[in-house]
Amino acid sequence: MIRQDILQRFPDLFGTQHVNGRDIDVEETIAALTRELRPEIAAALTARRQVLRSPEPVRKRYAWPRWDETFADPVSGKAWTFRDIVQGLIDNFLGRESARRWRLNDEVPIPDDAHPLANPGLELTGPWHPLDMAFNALNSPAPMNMPDFEDASPPHFRPDGTPSHEPIGIFAAMQNAKEIFEGRWNERPYEVVKKGKTRSYRITTPPAKWPTRFGRPPGLHVLYDHVTVDGQPAPGLIAVVVLWVLNNYEALHRAGTGVYFYIPKMQTPQEALILEKLLARLEGMIGVPAGTFKIKVLYEEGIAGLWLPAIAWVLRRRLLGTNVGRWDYLGSMMEMWKDDPQGVFPDPQNIGMASPSMIAYQRYNALIMLLAGMKNGELTQGAPIGG
């Protein structure tokens, strides 16, 4: 199921990995999770397309959820209404005990190195292939880095001018991460010829001072032709998450850190539930409590704002915070309003984070994270990110 050239070039990434005292096969895990979640992913993507193609007026198409709309709870297996979820947020903020009350990260505490308040600051992202990009990321004084398997690591092509012998960046970056975390580059230089000159790179920062790493997988819509299950391309989200967990959990755990992800392009609670199932299944496979893998979510889709309380609720065992950003959010607003003859499209070149609409966006994000992140009168269970 792994394309032969990928398997031959990166054999370390596949086959049986020893994780938390268990032997787990990478390909079998990708296949099992793909078979389980592929129908749900297809349904979620169909729902996206139906919204975009809907003939309903924009204001109706993107209306707030009904109070009696129900959502599946991955924790209890019961259904909650949107009213229950929002009331539970309010009860939590007010410190009021009730059956509806809920908050973030109540089961597995947030590690200090992943906590958005204990370890705040600049969050950098970029590809981890070529290797010097990964070295530069780890030598950075920034507190957090996202090895990027989304925007910066295209799986289907090599950029113009790339020699034919160069590997597919996704898998090369994954191999680089595995080797670095296992200490294979601690005392070794990486030498590469650039513009006719040999350049040498080293990791100069001790591992204890490296930025916290949050792997950024692709969105639900991306398929990997290099990994197939039952003759069909596997979802990139599943492939990357499985490869990252099974190849890196041991080394990250030994280093005193953990498995963390930055999730892009999330739009609805339906999509959040797919992610929660994926992560919970993997936690069960390696024998750690549900909620051990922590995540941040990029709130970069305007439609996600309608569902933000429910998205946070579905992910409450592991969500550290939701991140606001400008470029993708404005693009999503254009997509939402494209069919409205009265629509006014934002100009990303001129609208900054201090514009009134963007201030409202940031305040709303902060409000939801404040309501969900409070415990004993303090914001300890999560926090808004960015803005």
Whereabouts are the PLM-identified features?
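Glycine-rich loop at the start of a catalytic domain that most often binds anionic cofactors/ligands
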Residues: V58-F82, N139-P141, R158-A177
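Conserved alpha/beta-domain cores
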Residues: I2-D12, H18-N20, D25, F71, ...
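N-terminal active-site wall of soluble small-molecule enzyme domains
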Residues: G77, D84, S98-I110, P116, ...
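Low-complexity, highly charged intrinsically disordered N-terminal segments
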Residues: V19-A99
